[in-house]
Structures are given as structure tokens and as C-alpha cells.
């Protein structure tokens, strides 16, 4: 509707609909302004305790919007303090294209006593994080093994070994390689060396978590929960063999 408004191409009903949306946004902005005045990162301690009581430890937190370029220092500090209150060792965001922002995030992370782990998709390669790592000890990695393979990289184990002390968490999924079409596949059916990567972590006693990220199409005769059980079993079998 806003694009059509710029072209002066709105019907009478669309003008009314857009006016209603503007009113809703103004109301939401007012509520958000009031919330910002009273927000407290310590409120996240209650959420952490709820998860801990259920046997779940929160190791990472992705307040993606609040970490993006253009946000105020206050918003970024709040996001990092919330992550720390949750018990996370790091907050995550896609590695910014603008290196001045990763520099800023690194400085604020150091101030808040937490790390910023930079995620990637098919932009990833072994040198992709170099600038951010040089900028601050608080800048670390949150790579994605499946996307790394889909990007056409063939140095997976070299990459993991090189950055083992800088990887704070890693997503695992099974994707086809760039040459084979990059599709997301059930575990064990793609080109991603999940089994070998997990065994490398085990044998070298790397302590960072590997997180299953479910992205392949759920078969018609199955459910996401059933498929996740298969993913977990695949990983357990890899570690037991």
C-alpha cells in the first residue's frame, strides 16, 4: 500500500486501510516508547530460570533486530545485557557488510561482558570473518556447516580446526554442495560431512555446541517432530561410532 501511495495509485478503500494502519502504528509506537522507558534486562533472568528448571541451558541469544546497524547504543546494550541475563555466552547476528558496525558491536560486547558470534549463509568462506576477528576479542563465530558446504567450500575440517577456539556455536544441517544444487536434505543424504565434523569435535574435545537447524522439507507421511528425532539419532550414532 505504501508503494502504491508513493505512486498516487490508491483506491478510496485502500486509502482508508492505509490510514487505519498508520493509526495502529502510531499506537504501537507509543506503547513501545513507554516500554522502552521501563525495560529491564534483568526480567530475562526469570525466563532463564524457567528454561533451567526444565533442564535447558541457553548458550546463545539472537536479538537480531536490536543488533542491526542503525540501532542506538542503548538498544544494542540492552540486547547484550538480555543475552547475559539469559545465561548466554554470546549473542548472534549475520556478519555485517559494513566493518565499522562489527567494530562497534565488538566494543559494546566487551563493555557488556559477552561475545558477538557472527552467523553466515552461503557468503561463508575460511577468511570471511577475518576483519571482525581482528577488530575485537569479543567478535567470534557462529558458522553454519550446511551453508558452508552449499557455498562450494571444500575445507570444512581445516576451517573447524583453525577456528575451534573462536567458534562459540555452530548450526548443522545437511545441504547438497554448490555443484550438486545446494538442496536441504534429510541428515545423511546431502553432501555436508555432519558425521565427520561431530567426530572431529568429539576427538579434539571442542566444547562449542552444534545445533540442529531443521530446514529440509518434511515428508508428507511424517512430521517435523519425527524428522527431528531422526536428526538427533543420526548425530548420536555419529558420536557413538
Q: Which positions does each model-derived feature cover?
A:
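Active-site acidic/histidine proton-transfer and metal-coordination neighborhood
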Residues: 33-37, 43-50, 54-140, 149-151
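Histidine-acidic metal/acid-base catalytic patches
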Residues: 3-6, 10-23, 29-32, 36, ...
